[in-house]
Amino acid sequence: MSVTPVLDPEWQRSPEGLDYLSRVLRHNKRKFFGLIERPVLPPHLPADVAAYKVFVCGKSGVGKTSFIAKLSGLAVPSMHHETAGIQTTCMYWPVRPSGSARPVIFRFQFWDCGEGALRKFDHILPACKEKADAVLFLFSFTDRSSFEDVPALISRTLDQDEDVTRVVIGTKLDQYMHTDVTEDDLRDFQRTWQLPVMRVRSVNGPRMTDGRDLDGRAGLAECAPVLNGLAEILWHRDQVIAGLVGGAE
């Protein structure tokens, strides 16, 4: 049975949607926002802001930092470096709820921490989970063990009674010649665990004509499926909590 989206999937391609998207760009490059910054909107572009804390976890080397860099418009690191302590990154993503004339700008605050810090300091995991709206469990398409470890990773990270949205993300989709995880594997996983699975490439997108800076618009288009998917899941959850739409049967 098909489910009607709670967010308009075509709005971002409209002139109005493109105007809102331009507010997270500067000279066709991505703007970067600090913890207390937000896009500046002119009076003719009203919008509400919906803030969400998202904890990104996974075994060392699956590409957590690269995943966040990709979504936020930063350059994907060329070499792996363990994240020291906790790192937070804010990004904004405009959407429009179905049946509404007023857009909503999602404020995603991604929390990332290194596996070594998690093992060494007992306070790291509780801090990352505190008031989190979603936990993203990452695996790499080039590392089958990271995929097979996802159920155990979920159990280690969350108790069964913790009411947090769970999403699985497959990274390094670009390295399809070296993939160790098949589409059949993903279908079996989704059928067994009833969790959404998304896919992301772990390489930089096109660059500007100067050859140095990343093309912001191209980067937004590349990340749109994951950002829209995450926004849809979280907005639907909030609508269910508010009693505005029905939950899953």
From Swiss-Prot:
Could you tell me which residues belong to the region Small GTPase-like? 46-249
Q: Which organism is it from?
A: Xenopus laevis
Record GO biological process: cilium assembly; exocytosis; neural tube closure; protein localization; protein transport; regulation of exocytosis; regulation of vesicle fusion
Q: Pfam families recorded for this chain?
A: Ras
Q: Does the keyword ATP-binding apply?
A: no
Instruction: List the keywords (alphabetical).
Output: Cell projection, Cilium, Cilium biogenesis/degradation, Cytoplasm, Cytoskeleton, Exocytosis, GTP-binding, Nucleotide-binding, Protein transport, Transport
Q: Which GO terms describe its molecular function?
A: GTP binding; GTPase activity
- Provide the function of this protein: Potential effector of the planar cell polarity signaling pathway. Plays a role in targeted membrane trafficking most probably at the level of vesicle fusion with membranes. Involved in cilium biogenesis by regulating the transport of cargo proteins to the basal body and to the apical tips of cilia. More generally involved in exocytosis in secretory cells.
UniProt keyword S-adenosyl-L-methionine present: no
What is this protein's name? Ciliogenesis and planar polarity effector 2
Localization annotation: Cytoplasm, Cytoskeleton, Cilium basal body
InterPro entries noted in UniProt: P-loop_NTPase (IPR027417), RSG1 (IPR039677), Small_GTPase (IPR001806)
Q: What is the effect of changing T65N?
A: Loss of localization to the cilium basal body. Dominant negative form altering cilium biogenesis
Q: Gene Ontology cellular component? A: ciliary basal body; cytoplasm
